[in-house]
Amino acid sequence: MKPSMRAKLDHLDTRLAELNSLLTSEEATKDMDAYRKLTREHSDIATVVEQFYLYKQAEADAQAAEEMRKDPEMKEFADEEQKQALATMEALESTLQKLLLPKDENDERNVFLEIRAGTGGDEGALFAGDLLRMYTRFAERQGWKVEVVSAAESDLGGYKEVVLRLVGQAVYSRLKFESGGHRVQRVPQTETQGRIHTSACTVAVMPETDELEAVKINPAELRIDTFRASGAGGQHINKTDSAIRITHLPTGTVVECQDDRSQHRNREQAMKVLVSRIMDAREREKHQLEAQTRKSLVGTGDRSDRIRTYNFPQGRITDHRINLTLYKIDAMMDGDIDDLCNALASEHQAELLAALGDN
């Protein structure tokens, strides 16, 4: 084990003892917010330290076996004991490396997922509808709740833009690598000559913030407009100005919400999306600065990056960041994207491990 890694583990061991003392003190529960933070930290560290204790026990066993090997009568037995102890140490070191990886504080959050049609006109909008179905079906498979925040439909039944709110367990951790450019190659329904067209959409996955206070927004910097909701019709459509459009003047960020009949709830939801977009822009700026010092294949989330191609004639989906091609496009467009999400998460973990090894 590298000295730097051992030093981190020794520090966590010391910190766990401090937390045990703090949590059992009479003062601990006087500030419940602070108490909850301490219990979360204790839970995170205890798992690591428990594995570190097992590692040190295996290390002691290996050293004891080395001493035992000096006795000729015990050498064969000692060799086997030492072999087992070293194998245990190797496995535990690998586990500890992963446990020490920096955690993304957003991993457990719900998300706003935004799909925008790019190049390709009507075909791009139809593909946006296909991506909407793919992510909706994937969310249903995970047991997540799906809410449509806003949707701008195209003439042929696709979407110029659609924003979803996905609520469930660890939503962001599963979908955070979906941000970027998605390209489709196929024969459009409107194509009479059978020619393959290329269209594109942009996907943005933004973690939902816990509190609006996470981003300080001056109300004077907001322009709030109300308008009549548009939709498929019905007795409740276009009767009141319940839809909300909020413009953040300093950044030019615009958010619309018309999913609810209540103007108050639409405004509340629009503010959540606005805060998430502003936070997302700041995170992307930070990641771009980090990328200048460390090349990351998976985790940049740059909207201008073409991350994936969906080739329908060949029945394949290719993720260009990890050079992975899967020939099951029909199943994947129906929400079966677990293999892709797992591969991207594994690549990201490998990058983090490599960075940890460099330190």
UniProtKB/Swiss-Prot annotation:
Q: What is this protein called?
A: Peptide chain release factor 1
Give one Pfam family: RF-1
Family annotation (InterPro entries): PCRF, Pep_chain_release_fac_I, Pep_chain_release_fac_I_sf, Prokaryotic/Mito_RF, RF-1
Would you identify the family this protein belongs to, as annotated? Answer: Belongs to the prokaryotic/mitochondrial release factor family.
Q: Which GO terms describe its cellular component?
A: cytoplasm
User: Which gene produces this protein?
Assistant: prfA
Q: Which GO terms describe its molecular function?
A: translation release factor activity, codon specific
User: What is the role of this chain?
Assistant: Peptide chain release factor 1 directs the termination of translation in response to the peptide chain termination codons UAG and UAA.
- Keyword Protein biosynthesis part of the UniProt annotation: yes
Q: How is it modified after translation?
A: Methylated by PrmC. Methylation increases the termination efficiency of RF1.
Q: Which UniProt keywords apply?
A: Cytoplasm, Methylation, Protein biosynthesis
Q: Which Gene3D superfamilies match?
A: 3.30.160.20, 3.30.70.1660, 6.10.140.1950
Q: Where in this protein does the record say N5-methylglutamine is found?
A: Q235
Q: Where in the cell is it found?
A: Cytoplasm
Predominant location? cytoplasm
